From Swiss-Prot:
The keyword Ribonucleoprotein applies. PROSITE patterns: RIBOSOMAL_L30E_2. It comes from Pyrobaculum aerophilum (strain ATCC 51768 / DSM 7523 / JCM 9630 / CIP 104966 / NBRC 100827 / IM2). NCBIfam families: PRK01018.1. One of its GO terms (molecular function) is structural constituent of ribosome. Belongs to the eukaryotic ribosomal protein eL30 family. This is Large ribosomal subunit protein eL30. The gene is rpl30e. The keyword Transferase does not apply. GO terms for biological process: translation.
């Protein structure tokens, strides 16, 4: 089992991760990230929007099993995070989340 918080930290430190709903949406429209992570309590409108663009781009979505506050804490940020996009996983194995939950 992958430790989501640890792998997210490794991805942030060694790869490229964009944080926030708008930034994630921009990444989907322009750069095709490798994985999208959504907080379990993301509002329906936001989830629908991200899921639509992710489906068009063929990008897998992982629903983080916690709130936006917990996702922010997992990313070592002092704020809520509703969505984030992994552009480059770096040395992490975070992309295996998409395989496990496909």
């Amino acid at each position: 089992m992958i430790d989501i918080s640890r792998e997210l930290q490794v991805a942030i430190n060694t790869g490229k991760v964009v944080i926030g709903f708008e930034e994630t949406k921009k990444a989907l429209l322009t750069g095709a990230p490798k994985l999208i992570i959504l907080a379990a309590n993301a509002p329906k409108w936001a989830r629908d929007d991200i899921e639509y663009y992710a489906k068009l781009a063929g990008v897998p979505i992982f629903v983080f099993p916690g709130s936006s506050i917990e996702l922010g804490a997992a990313a070592k940020r002092p704020h809520k995070i509703m969505a984030l996009a992994v552009i480059d996983a770096g040395q992490s194995e975070i992309l295996k989340l998409a395989e496990q939950h496909a």
